[in-house]
């Protein structure tokens, strides 16, 4: 299942893929679905994978919670580097958490649940990092570089 605002992640031929798109309120319809609502709806479905195409808001908290409950999940996010991607997702999740979690707790949740961070620029893979655990002293994710262009 892929929840996204724009068609960044697509396939026209895979029979087992479900795509949910956000819908803005317009003059023609008062119906509105944002990525947060789509993420909540997605988590109630019996899906094998939960993917958010371009995290940029409160849906980040649902992505982290889904992963932390054992749901296989992935996301795209715009960031400056592979190491900056989890930080960016945490920035968005902090907006949604209402101070329920702090930055270190959310980063540790990511470190516990995700294994790989890939940085893509201009349709080229620039960097691949393995998440190698959590450093309690520095309160940060430990990485192992697997590939760098």
Where would I find each of the regions flagged by the language model?
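Switch/coupling sub-region of P-loop NTPases
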Residues: 1-111
């Amino acid at each position: 299942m892929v929840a996204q605002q724009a068609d960044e992640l697509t396939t026209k031929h895979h029979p087992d893929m479900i795509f949910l798109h956000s819908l803005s309120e317009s003059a023609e319809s008062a119906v509105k679905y944002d990525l947060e609502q789509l993420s909540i709806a997605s988590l109630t479905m019996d899906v094998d994978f939960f993917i958010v195409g371009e995290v940029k808001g409160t849906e980040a908290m649902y992505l982290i919670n889904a992963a932390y409950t054992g749901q296989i999940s992935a996301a795209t996010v715009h960031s400056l580097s592979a190491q900056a991607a989890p930080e960016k997702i945490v920035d968005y999740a902090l907006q949604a958490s209402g101070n329920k979690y702090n930055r270190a707790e959310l980063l540790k949740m990511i470190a516990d649940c995700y294994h790989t961070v890939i940085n893509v620029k201009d349709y080229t893979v620039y960097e691949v990092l393995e998440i190698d655990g959590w450093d309690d002293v520095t309160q940060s994710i430990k990485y192992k570089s697997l590939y760098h262009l």
